[in-house]
C-alpha cells in the first residue's frame, strides 16, 4: 500500500498542467470520486489495523498535495488568460486622440519680442534671479532711501548677518545690464529677458512675479531719437502697423531724460473704457537715456559714450496682444484658457 502511495505521489508531482484541458485531465484522474486517490482510500479497509492509521495519514497528505496543485494551477491559468485578454489589440475600436500641448501665451510673446530685437542687432543676455543689492540698486543710481529698497516693495533673502550684503529676488532685469557693462566694452546692444519679483498685492493688473524684457544700447553719439525709432519699430511689429504711441515724461533713477510709452487701448481703440481708465491709452514700457552716473559705475566714460535703455512687462504685452483682462489668468494654468492658444 505504501508503495502505491509513493508511486502515485511521484506521478502527481510530475504531471504538467499547462492548459485548461490538462487541468481538467488532472482533476478527472486524481480528484474525482472514481479517481486514483479515491481508489486508494477504498483499499484502506484491507490494511492491517496496526498500519491503517499511518497509511491514512499518508493518503490525506497525498490528497491535500493534489488539491493544492490543482488550485494553484487553476489560479495561474486564470491570471494568464486575463493578462492575454488585456494585451489583445482590437483593431475595430476607435483610436484615442493624443492630447497636444500648446505654447504658453507669455512664451509666445517673449519669443516674438526676441525675434524682433535680434533682427535689429540686439544680443540676448541673462543673469541670476537671486541678486545682491549692489547690482539691483547701487550701480543703478538708486539713492539709499529710495522706496524700492523697502521690504514692502522687494523680497529680501535673509542669509548670514555677518555678510553685510543685501540679497534679494531681483525687481527688474537691469542688473543683467550692469553685469554686461562691467564685462564688455562699447558698443553694447543687448536685451535681457527673465522673471522678476515685486512685493505687490495680487490683482487683475499686477502679480508678485512676472516676466520682463529690458534693452540696452551703448555707443558713441546715441540719441533719444535712436531710442524712439527703436520703440516705434518694435511696437509696429508687435501690435500692428495701425497702433498709435505716446511718449510721456517720467522719472527713473537710472535714466535721464526718462519717458513712459503708451499704446492705444486694445479694447476701446482709444475711445476710453474701464481697462484704460477712460484715457484711451495703456502703458507698455519705460525708457530713457542711460544716466551718466550708471555709466561711471560701470567704468564707461559718459563724455565719450551715451546710450538708451528700455524695459517692458512681457505679461502685460501678452494681455494687450490677446485682449486678456486679468493677468492672473496667465499664472493659473487653466487648460480651458491655454487651449485657446493651441495651433
UniProtKB/Swiss-Prot annotation:
Binding-site list for Mg(2+): 256
Name this polypeptide is given: Phenylalanine--tRNA ligase alpha subunit
Species annotation: Prosthecochloris aestuarii (strain DSM 271 / SK 413)
InterPro entries (alphabetical): aa-tRNA-synth_II (IPR006195), aa-tRNA-synth_II/BPL/LPL (IPR045864), Phe-tRNA-synth_IIc_asu (IPR004529), Phe-tRNA_ligase_II_N (IPR004188), Phe_tRNA_ligase_alpha1_bac (IPR022911), Phenylalanyl-tRNA_Synthase (IPR002319), tRNA-bd_arm (IPR010978)
Any one Gene Ontology BP term: phenylalanyl-tRNA aminoacylation
Keywords, ordered alphabetically: Aminoacyl-tRNA synthetase, ATP-binding, Cytoplasm, Ligase, Magnesium, Metal-binding, Nucleotide-binding, Protein biosynthesis
Recorded GO MF terms: ATP binding; magnesium ion binding; phenylalanine-tRNA ligase activity; tRNA binding
Catalytic reaction list: tRNA(Phe) + L-phenylalanine + ATP = L-phenylalanyl-tRNA(Phe) + AMP + diphosphate + H(+)
CC annotations in GO: cytoplasm
Upper taxonomic lineage: Bacteria, Pseudomonadati, Chlorobiota, Chlorobiia, Chlorobiales
Keyword ATP-binding: yes
Similarity comment: Belongs to the class-II aminoacyl-tRNA synthetase family. Phe-tRNA synthetase alpha subunit type 1 subfamily.
Requisite cofactors: Mg(2+)
EC number(s) stated in the UniProt entry for this protein: 6.1.1.20
CDD domains: PheRS_alpha_core
Subunit relationships: Tetramer of two alpha and two beta subunits.
Subcellular location: Cytoplasm
Main location: cytoplasm
Cofactor note: Binds 2 magnesium ions per tetramer.
